[in-house]
Amino acid sequence: MSSKPDILTIDPLVPVMKERLEKSFTLHPYTSLENLKNIAPAIRGITTGGGSGVPSEIMDALPNLEVISVNGVGTDRINLDEARRRNIGVAITQNTLTDDVADMAVALMMAVMRSIVTNDAFVRAGKWPSATAPLGRSLTRKKVGIAGFGHIGQAIAKRVSAFGMEVAYFNSHARPESTCHFEPDLKALATWCDVLILAVSGGPRSANMIDRDTLDALGKDGFLVNIARGTVVDEAALLSALQEKRIAGAGLDVFQNEPNINPAFLSLPNTVLQAHQASATVETRTTMANLVVDNLIAYFTDKTLLTPVI
């Protein structure tokens, strides 16, 4: 019988993570609740992604679960109250993906405002010799509203300021260390800005916070960028606003029903779409994978976590 702790792996493992985990743990890929019954008492740890989390039925099925190591920074799909009640440690890959996610927010903003994807398609379709390429919008002197002003939101502010853009932010509380204007009313922020960038945490508190009223406040010349969670946006309201051109466009990295997104998005020329790729660089994903493993090793060595939430 192996002396290695048994770990349930909910998401597929990248090679560097799998190789390192196999040296210290016995791995059990999750397939179904039915199959989990056979190994449930042995499972002491879980690896998962921020998008997958740990469904309650899985947590409930594991009587000896001690630790969850998340490959990401989102915990909205983990019942943290239940984890606290059961004294289950939870760790995330804190401070590993801030720069790449902020870069993606700026890339989406530029792509949709400057019509980069539309112009790429225009050239590839051979239209350049006989037609006029569509115009984009300037970034300089535009106003950017950032909803959510944690590490990622502040990194976005630093980047867009370099373009000569004015920044204000909405957050649960003011950040006195920032020189940007704090706007406690989200609709007022949407009314003020030309670009609204979403960097809030997921979960019930932020669910559908971007609704029809907020989008109408953003207006026909406004752009929406979402690198937060798909649940933050009322997608029916967003699709309606895009189809009716009540907002100018949207750059979206996240959706409500990933990866099976609403097909209505696919035919909209005023959108730029990504497959939840904001942190998807070789460098960052390698750093994240190593931290997931390091947290598990630290826990099973001396019951500590390097980047704990709980």
Swiss-Prot record:
Pfam families: 2-Hacid_dh, 2-Hacid_dh_C. It catalyses: D-gluconate + NADP(+) = 2-dehydro-D-gluconate + NADPH + H(+). Keywords: Gluconate utilization, NAD, NADP, Oxidoreductase. GO terms for biological process: D-gluconate metabolic process. InterPro entries: D-isomer_2-hydroxyacid_DH, D-isomer_2_OHA_DH_cat_dom, D-isomer_DH_NAD-bd, NAD(P)-bd_dom_sf. The active site is at R229, E258, H276 (proton donor). NADP(+) binds at H151, I152, I227, A228, R229. GO terms for cellular component: cytosol. Its EC number is 1.1.1.215. It is an enzyme of class 1 (oxidoreductase). One of its GO terms (molecular function) is gluconate 2-dehydrogenase activity. Homohexamer. Catalyzes the reduction of 2-keto-D-gluconate to gluconate. Can also catalyze the reduction of 2-keto-L-gulonate. Can use both NADH and NADPH efficiently, with a slight preference for NADPH. Belongs to the D-isomer specific 2-hydroxyacid dehydrogenase family. This is 2-ketogluconate reductase. It comes from Gluconobacter oxydans (strain 621H) (Gluconobacter suboxydans).
